[in-house]
Amino acid sequence: LGDVYKRQAQLWAAEAHEYVFFIRTGHLDEETFRAYNDALLEEGLSRVEPKKDHMYTYVSVVFLAESIAPEVPKLIKKTRCHRDYRMSLYGWMDYRIAAYDCTSKRIYTNWAGRPLKQTLLSVTKKRRKHK
């Protein structure tokens, strides 16, 4: 009948990952923030697997607190971690932080965490409508 040839080619591939950690606490002070921040950044970095098809990984931390100490929003805003792997050929990683103050209904983020603010706003608006 003849020969059958099969050719497979992968033209394009990209892996994108996000690891989200939720922390619920009564009062978020500087000491608590730093302890969680250090531990979760280390944990998130350990999960990143830079390789040929890796495009990006987001490590996101969301704090849900009854109250937030006045110095913590400044710490959140100043906290940054961005890693490029092999000049971005093996992708990159961003560390995103958001904190929601349940008492004042305020949301604080670092620069990379700005998209989290929109998500938290939409979730809290829906929650307020259902009460």
Segments and roles (model prediction):
Residues 42-51:
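A short, acidic, amphipathic alpha-helical segment used as a generic capping/interface helix at domain edges
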Residues 34-39, 73-80:
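"Short basic amphipathic alpha-helical interaction patches in structured regions
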Residues 10-40:
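Active-site ExK catalytic segment of metal-dependent nucleases
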Residues 78-131:
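Charged, structured surface patches that assemble and position nucleic-acid processing machinery
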Residues 2-5:
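Short, small-residue-biased leader/transition segments that mark boundaries at the very start
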Residues 31, 69-74, 108-109:
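Switch/connector loops and helix/strand junctions flanking conserved nucleotide-binding motifs
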Residues 16-19, 56-59, 95:
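Short, surface-exposed beta-edge/turn micro-motifs
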Residues 51-75, 101:
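Nucleic-acid nuclease catalytic cores
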